[in-house]
Amino acid sequence: MKKRLQQLILILFLPFMTFHSLVGQDIIPLPSQVISAPGFFYFSGGTNINADKNIVIPTYLNNYLKQKQATLNSKGVQNDILFSIANNGLSEGYELKITTNKIYLTGNDEKGLFYGMQSLIQLLQHQPLTNGSITLPCQTITDQPRFGYRGIMLDAGRYFQPMSYIKELLDIMAAYKFNTFHWHLTEDQGWRVEIEKYPKLMSKSAWRSETVIGHHNQKPRVYDGEKHGGYYTKADIKEIVAYAAERNITVIPEIEMPGHATAAIAAYPELGCTGKDLEVPRDWGVKEDVYCPSEATFKFLEDVLTEIIPLFPSPYIHIGGDECPKKQWKESALAQSVMKREGLKDEDALQSYFIKRMEAFLKTKGKKLIGWDEILEGGLAPDATVMSWRGIKGGIEAAHLGHDVIMSPNTFCYFDYYQSDAPGEPLAIGGKLTVEKVYSFDPIPDELPAETHKHILGGQGNIWTEYISTLPKLRYMAYTRMLALSEVLWTPVAKKEFLPFAVRLNKHIDYWKTKNIDFANHLFEIKPTLTSREEGLEVTLTPLVPWGEIRYTLDGTMPKSTSAVYVNPLLLTQKTVVKTQSFVQNQPKGNPISIDFLPHKGLQAKILSKTTPSKTYKGAGERGLINGISGSKDQFNDGEWQGITPGETFSMKLSWTDKQAIKGIQFHIYNDPESWIYLPSEATIYTSQDGNIFSKACETKITEDKDTKTLAVDIPCKIKSQFIEIKIPAIGTIPVNRPGSGNQAWLFLDEIRVY
């Protein structure tokens, strides 16, 4: 009992304590191995840095160590830090050995030495300065990365970022051992790179007249009336590439093709299929204007790449390849003539032809091609590397074909998603991606055979910027989840554990706050688990991390330090508003959570059968659609909404112990065409006398409402029955001229109220 109490105290107060013996465990990403030893090294003004002659200490690291009062010295003395390179072992690996009078940092190569320096900096950052020195416990850290590609993508197309923003992002990347910066430089909404041969790309394509305010799906749309844009000169790009290189980061440019090209076509209409004059779009979403596969277009793109390639030493050039609508190609005589000439069976094959031509050109320049997973459509270019974003399916397919893969699935790696269900979260594109879920990501899927693992180069987090226009918001949306991803990509799977990571993460968040850099901190939030029972709704409250205690109210008021402490699950039997929050030492922490329970007849029903939702969007489980809880109005991935697998019709059959006097049924549906989620056109209620044979009782037609994201559909239906069935078919194939056209539409449902 005494031992258990000691463990509990450790868990509760670990985030607020400093344990010298665990100092190596403060590092993010967690090293492969940390072995403690007796004694301490005292880092002070008397500490000298001694490096081999061929080692160049980066300027910024030099400056950091000087701030810590260390002295650069070529002669080894007591209290030294010794830098060396072994030129053996796995690339990027290192050993950091701290003894009582010396610190030995040995890199397997220059990259390994650099990452060892990052670990040393973290050790110094997280130890207090006492009497003019920092005390570091003796230990040996042996470390190397799990994956060779550890990337972050920044979208400069939607919003142009000043150089200072990018440099800060690169600093954070370097500190947490990311080694690749994927720079998304062209988009429908803006062209961001200087091309001397095509000056209108800078004068026209780089600027839009104004920008939509609020979410893209909000209607009517409102605009800010302010011209926005900018581009990076070749000198700017060289400066960023050099800045990144000093931090061991390779910069990969992305020049989008054949889709996401409206900004370029606005400057040079002959590149498109219609020849119409266009403006750079003021709002978001996939646009139908794409490059037409003419020789003039290929000449333009080759000219662009010819100017781009010398700026970037990276072996790769990213050509996009995603979300390319085929409508204009279907209608274009030129595109159809190319298909006939090349013997291409459809527009997917035309896209493949387009990508293969660009890959062949890049090969002549000594570069390799990366594309988003849509480049698989119609046949993959011979040596292309696939960046899998639409889940992991594309990555698995490419690996089976023998192609290299960078895993970047939106469900784990899109940092423009919401981080929490809490009210007051800043506007995001939608969905939800918690730091815990990012941490659970494994770039190597279980279903991938061992012999294909070598093709998984690593992973990448993506910062799409439709809703990220400022540096503070970029920090809030990206940095915390970047730290989780850094450990995914560096640390051995067997060493990963979320709770110890959360302890370290909390310390790092606090450290950066002292530098006036605010990370999001959702570690103190509470996860409610809702279980629908015949007698009501059972609410189980679980903290993300077990620090402090949970307090709650049942009357809709905010919890205080004197509110009830949560001990056991709550059973709600009547209309109730639960509010709950974490408290540490009687102080509220994290965001409060609200649960609005509205009971109805469906809670007492037995589910005879129900369409199984997609594994990705299964909501609150089997009874989640009749649990008395409504989902978010702006997040379809909030844990309540259920996504029906595209192509399926939703059906749910309910039964009661006796006949029920029912007045009608109400359900909520989600409307987000940009995410391929469409409103259904109809819904039908059926009744049965025996639970086997059902007949139509009531139906309703659903009119598309473009002005709302969630729609409540009410079906008045006065019946008395023991058995009912609700059927809601998805619209099927997404029509032409709509986002996702040609694909099967998603249907998302929320609470089905039987009243």
Regions found by a protein language model. Give the residues of each.
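Bacterial Sec-dependent N-terminal signal peptides
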Residues: 1-26
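Aromatic, loop-rich ligand-recognition surfaces of beta-strand-rich domains
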Residues: 634-696, 704-755
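Feature activates predominantly on carbohydrate-active enzymes
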Residues: 89-298, 302-316, 357, 361, ...
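Active-site neighborhood of glycoside hydrolase catalytic domains
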Residues: 264-269, 281-282, 287-382, 389-397
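Short, compositionally stereotyped local motifs that mark structural "simplifiers"
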Residues: 492, 496-651, 670, 679
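Contiguous, structured surface segment used for ligand recognition
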Residues: 24-147, 473, 489-499, 503, ...
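Flexible, acidic glycine-rich loops studded with aromatic residues
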Residues: 368-374, 379-384, 390-538
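Surface-exposed loop/turn motifs at beta-strand-loop junctions within extracellular Ig-like
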Residues: 109, 582-586, 730-732
